[in-house]
């Protein structure tokens, strides 16, 4: 005789309840050959369901040996047992155990997904099986739209999806009326005749009478194992499908990933309000991260733009030791010769002397106090000052102490008002008449007063005709592009120290101010981002809580999936994907909301704008994904660790 398909030797199964242990199965010896139709009959509590669970690899024996087609199952892990369930067994349950949110076709397809059958083939096979069972007109119906008999036929089709070499039917007619029950038994007899091994688990002798072999179980022991003569003709198993291969397992992993996304989407849209509330924390966190990053970048660019407007690559040299030095007014060592020496340095683009004083300006009957600055023709280049109209004075103007002046926008407005062209007009600076040859463009930045009045005259004119001062208040040096600011500053200090013989001056490097602004901006952005991260963590905890609830609500679904061949890794992947999808949707909404805030921001604040970067968006997406993985792991792990028998028993 051929080797048994299923062989149990000395199988025992014990359970612990508190301090007590009781045996559900006691030293069971049983062999079942391929193509047999066996009925396991017994009263409630006899151990027949426990025996069926062990046969179907849903449970494990406490002691003894169980071989499937010669393969010992005692030391197999959960993944190997799941593969055996998938490749050998098809389950038909008393309560059908169909997933309520899936159509008949998709319920039938489920085992083939875990077996790695490509979507077109499994879809065609599911339709074929349902058509053979008389359900060709109900392919897209959900379980709630089917009668009990129709649901059981869907369950039978699902059991046959992967070939169903062994059909395990647990009270297949228990929840059906007489007519539907007879129809189900007819189908099972046809399957047996087609070569399937059919194992019926029932308490009804009439159902058991359809089998060719009846095994009676009581108190965990086999009381009898007798033949029941019937006219049967075993045929080849026409429903057999190829067993899993490495290539099919790769296809399976891809199919499972897609299925996980599909199931996640169905779960999300089935509980819209709960999903929205779950995502709320993620939305707030991502909106905060992206918006804060955009605001910080916009503020930084605004400040740096203002610094660059006054010359970010400039170094100013002053008398004294530092700002506020009371002795600086008495130090008169900065002289035009220093400017000439600085202009000789190869890394200096230009250097200009600066002297200044508040003097009275007069035009007709208008008198104003303004800051009068004596500078060289290079000053406007050093400071990056543009002309609104006219031209700056030239080197020849400086040499001949020309009585010319450049005024700023505010001075033009205060002296001449609207409708008067200031170019060519003569104003008094102190007692010196000067001709206006240029108007500097308005320079709005955080470092200049919007109300200050400034005029510029050639240094030689200021020193010789206005102030009578030969020493300088300061020197402004513009660094050539590409030269390191700190190195240039050190060399300027060395030159000045060499010329003066003592440190009677100090420098102010605006590049260091820019670096300080950037550092402060980064620190502030980091602080605000940490606050945003806290909201993300809170949102992640919310995701974990809801996912834990979801696992509890879908316990029976998890049990069904395990019964049809899902491995622990498949279940874990499905719930992880669901958590990640929730977080990614929340992240997408958060990013969109940030851009909407940026648009509103630009409508109300004209001076500067929020600057969104690809980096901040990618960071938001990565954060969403990581939160989904980190906070979805515990619920996913809990789902994968569920016992399939306990899960199937949940309502």
From Swiss-Prot:
Annotated protein name in UniProt: Probable export ATP-binding/permease protein Pfl01_2215
Residues annotated as domain ABC transporter: 6-244
Task performed by this protein: Probably part of a tripartite efflux system.
A Pfam short name: FtsX
Disulphide bonds in the chain: none
Superkingdom assignment: Bacteria
Residues spanning the membrane: 250-270, 276-296, 524-544, 585-605, 614-634
Entry EC no(s): 7.6.2.-
Keyword annotations of the record: ATP-binding, Cell inner membrane, Cell membrane, Membrane, Nucleotide-binding, Translocase, Transmembrane, Transmembrane helix, Transport
Subunit and interaction comment: Probably part of a tripartite efflux system, which is composed of an inner membrane transporter, a periplasmic membrane fusion protein, and an outer membrane component.
InterPro entries: AAA+_ATPase, ABC3_permease_C, ABC_transporter-like_ATP-bd, ABC_transporter-like_CS, MacB-like_ATP-bd, MacB_PCD, Macrolide_Exporter_MacB, P-loop_NTPase
Native organism: Pseudomonas fluorescens (strain Pf0-1)
UniProt GO molecular function: ATP binding; ATP hydrolysis activity; transmembrane transporter activity
Main location: membrane
GO cellular component terms, semicolon-separated: plasma membrane
Compartments in which it is found: Cell inner membrane
Entry keyword Disulfide bond: no
Annotated membrane topology: Multi-pass membrane protein
Protein family per UniProt: Belongs to the ABC transporter superfamily. Macrolide exporter (TC 3.A.1.122) family.
Amino acids binding ATP: 42-49
UniProt enzyme class: translocase
